[in-house]
Amino acid sequence: MATTRRIFCSQAAAVLLIPRLLLSQTKSTSRPDVAAIDHDRILESATHYLTQSPSPITILPCSRSPGTLNDFYSEAENYWPDPSNPTGPFVLRGGTPNPDAFNAHRDALLNFAICVPALTAAFVLTNESRYAQQALVHLHAWFLDPATRMTPSLLYGQTIRPAKTGQPEGVIEAVHLSEVVQCIPFLTNFEGFAESDLAAIKKWFAEYFDWLNTSRLAGLARDMKNHHGSSWLLQAASIAHLNEISDDAPLTTLRHQYKSSTIRAQIVADGTFPRELTTPNPYRNTLFNLDMFAGICVLLSTRFESVWDYELQDGPGMRTVIARMFPYIQDRGAWPYRADATHFNELPIRPPSLLFAARAYNRPEYAELWKTLKPDPVSPELQRTFPIRQPLLWVTRPKP
């Protein structure tokens, strides 16, 4: 059949459209439908928490705490009594955790930080008020009720007995609050969320942000060149992001900190976190740190500036780090460093860093791998290193 001018033009137009069509397909596969993928998982978890009453730290007293009932208190579980000095400072002993170490506040805070995002995600999916109402019940107990609210500090976190103050490492025990902060803009769409309660919750986080920035203990955590420093930055960034509309200066400061010091302090030329590789659980802590870095990038990026793309002149950024870890998330057996001391075979859990990086870098292979991995850790030890459980709250824009 002879080629007419019309046929030729149609074929030429089709050829020209192919790259655009392929690009649109790539974009769609690098941005999976998180609401559809996690729908059943979210509702199952939220249904469980619909009937769970709050467990604030005030109902879990510890006679060894130097603070009040409202003060968070935990003890470093790798420290034991010194046999040569029974009344002296506890000494570090690796391996088996000390079963006498008090960590009920840590566990209660973790449960709270799993509960509220699950309920909020269910509210986002269904718009059913019962989920938002139950989330507010827990928020009220932890942040508003004077009798049960937690003091907005971690002054006594990871205390080494018989000391009367905590350690910088204690700040990481509140890293899960970062996802609780993500819930607040979504819950404001619930008509039962009183303006006064919203203001009081924001005030609690503002006071905690102030503690993070003025406390000597928190300052030491901020300056640590490993996952403890990342934990500080993720917490600070989440609160600054919450209050960005009223004051964007803190977020700008944190963005500068990430670009000027955090990357340089933690990432080396081959895209690894060298300080995580020296820990007893290098694989787990690398994934933990990567997830926190990814959350930080989500919070600090704007329509005009993506910190995902920032790289040092003499070193890499997040693009290199995620590319470096990708094959080891695909195949744990390819991990070239020593295996973790515990729970190595239970990893990887579905890392939010893969999903966020897929969206940031238009890498569908990251999203495809993310979809295949189990979403939730079972072991409490692993749960403590998994601060982002509801990615729906991180990739969805709240309704104004």
What spans do the regions from the language model cover?
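N-terminal export signals
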Residues: 7-24
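An alpha-helical repeat/solenoid feature that recognizes helix-turn-helix modules
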Residues: 170-173, 229-232, 286-289
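Extracellular glycan-targeting catalytic surfaces
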Residues: 13, 25-221, 274, 299-304, ...
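Short acidic-aromatic active-site loops that bind/stabilize oxyanions
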Residues: 105-109, 226, 283
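Long, repeat-rich segments with strong aromatic
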Residues: 238-333
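Eukaryote-skewed repeat-based solenoidal scaffolds used as protein-protein interaction platforms
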Residues: 188-260
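Alpha-helical scaffold elements that line and support the substrate/ligand-binding pocket
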Residues: 115-125, 233-239, 293-294
